[in-house]
Amino acid sequence: MTLQSTDSAIVIDSEADVDISSSQASPSKDNIALSEHNVITVLDTPQRSTQCDSLLKSFSTPLVSGSEDVLPSPRDALNITNKKSVTDNLLLSLTSSNQSTNTNLNPSSRVEIINLNSSPPNSLSSQPKHQEFHLFHTPTIPRTTQLSSKTSSPIVIPDDNEQVASPLSKKAASLTSSPLKDFQSSPPLSTVLQKSHSLHDILLDTNDDDHFPFTQSPLTKTKSFNDALTSSSSILKPCMPSIASPTSNRLSHAPSTPNLFPNQDSSNTIDLINNRSKTSVENQERTFNLTSDVHLDSPTSPSKHSSIEPNTSQEDSFQELPSLNKLSIQSRAFKKMRLPKISRTTDTPPASTSNSNKKNLDKLKKMRKLCSRSLEPYELDSNTQRKRKRYEDSLKKSKTLDKVDSLNRKMAKELDRKNSKELQKINKVKRTKEECLSEIILLSPDDWASSWYSTVRSQLDSYNCQFVVNSNQPKDSIMWKRKVNNVFNSSTNRFELSIEHEQIEPFALLRLKCRDFIKYIEEDQADTFFHEMSEKFKGCKLILLLEGIPNYFKSLKAELNRQYAAAVNSGTRPLLFGSLSKYQNFTKEKLESEIVRFSFEHSILINTSNDEKETAQWIVSFTGDIALSRYKHFSKFSARASTTEIGHVKSADRIENSLNFMLRQILRVTPNIANAICDQFDSIPSLIHHLKTHGEESLTNVVIQSSISERNLGPVLSRRIYNTFLCKEASSDAP
């Protein structure tokens, strides 16, 4: 017996009465007509799987046998005689009476058949590999249940896309490789009866509402296949009253099922069922999106099914079941009524639910990515949460530190750039008062907005000077401070940057009117006054501004002239006779001599002014000189020559280049010669010291390099350089 599967039918070849040798040798079996097959249409034909073959092997015997009590084995089936009983005649008459009903069926309805042939079973392994059983419910259009007779039963013509496979297409398979070889030995009668009863329980007593979930377990697949066959019990149960005959041992124990449609001629009922079935089937097909491909072993045209020729082979001995048209209609209508229940349970979910599920899935994917990134450094650590937090904290700190480091580097670069500019300004060769006034801070005992301080401030505001009030100072005095951010390095003869701070300048200015100064001299208190000022401005050079000397002597002369005029006008004898110098106790000459004495004895710088405006101008000038004094002071102790400041060597842009440009002024001294001498002597004093020590030919062996060759300076140029710097034998300078 061989099993052939398509999307629309399952064809099972029944056993033959011949042996293996006879089946292989007889070529007449190739043309066995389709009428020799027992055809049963089923609702759902699950695709075959290798796990389900064992189940099919157990009940793959013919439906009709010569015995009424036992289920014959394949080998016993081959020895059945061709005797027809009364029951067979009854079935044939019933089949012939129902032919007219069969022809009235709708030809467009889909019919799937199970073909039971009387040929020997082939090996299951010889079937095509692409034909597999899928253990899930396959919704299809309801079909007709039909049992074809050998002679008188008509055959239902299938659809255009359905072909019936040749039952003997694989006749070369041996009987020894058949799954039915386990039935070679005839079992006892009781065992066969038990098998028949158990098969009936499996096929007919299964719940109709069971569904077929898809599982991978072989046991589950077997059970699902049983359910798939028996869940369509509506196909077989209406047939039980007609099939339950003495010749059918397999279905003899089935209980009688009442007919669901007693009025079988009513076309309205069938049309109503067809409409309902059509709607439910469309819903199921849209839900499952099933596509079926029909694989045929031996395609046959529908015309072959209409003409059936009798066969004279050994298979005539088998008694075949007639086709029951009424039962097929009942099973089809019964299944149509049950389809909407399945379709309701398999409705597609709404679009909103799928959209929400998709959004949730996207969120889960994002969360998984975040978790995998955060846990990446600590995949093997058990304390994941604690490590993760520590890692995040360290990551934040590292990022913060990186930002701080980058900012520090940027600030350091900016500071270096700024410092380099400052150093260039500080080490500038030529410096002016205006450039240095921004470093000065002026201190006064009174408010700078009062009296003559306001005049000083108005003139120094444009130089960015600072003004501070210091109440500890004497009246009409000014002191200076400097904001310093560099230090002079005597070894390199350059200023270097340092921390900015304030330092007091060693200068103090005292403003004194000429009338007060003469009063101190007349009262012999001038020395005491200057000692007191030196103590208050200790460590500072005192600057004295005598304000109003010309005005004082002018007013004194005017006073004497007024007294003389008053005496003459009154007629009295005038007190003054001769020159005015006879009557003046303090003259200009005496004042000048006292100023010179105080300046030498007390080391005081004394200067005179006519009024407050001139005093303010003097203070501005003193402030500029004090601002420049620091740089002049350090320039005296440096090894830099003063020729650049004076302007003797105009081409020297820097002090270090002064010697080079001085040598170039000498006749026949080229830039290469000057560079060679400057490589050995970095300053003018060092060159002069060398010439004085080693004589006039001390530069003879100086190597002069050019792009072509090297040579020595020679004695002639050595003597010329010696005479130029030491001013000896000027006549030898001539070429």
From Swiss-Prot:
GO biological process: double-strand break repair; meiotic joint molecule formation; mitotic intra-S DNA damage checkpoint signaling; reciprocal meiotic recombination; replication fork processing; resolution of meiotic recombination intermediates
Major place of residence: nucleus
Subcellular location: Nucleus
The keyword Nucleotide-binding is annotated on this UniProt entry: no
Residues with Phosphothreonine modification: 400
Reaction it catalyzes: Endonucleolytic cleavage at a junction such as a reciprocal single-stranded crossover between two homologous DNA duplexes (Holliday junction)
Any GO CC annotation of this UniProt entry: Holliday junction resolvase complex
The entry's keywords: DNA damage, DNA recombination, DNA repair, Endonuclease, Hydrolase, Magnesium, Meiosis, Metal-binding, Nuclease, Nucleus, Phosphoprotein
PANTHER family in UniProt: CROSSOVER JUNCTION ENDONUCLEASE MMS4, EME1 PROTEIN
Remaining remarks: S.pombe appears to be critically dependent on the mus81-eme1 endonuclease for the resolution of meiotic crossovers. This may be due to the absence of an alternate pathway for crossover resolution such as the MSH4-MSH5 pathway which exists in S.cerevisiae and other eukaryotes.
Subunit structure: Interacts with mus81.
Protein name (record): Crossover junction endonuclease eme1
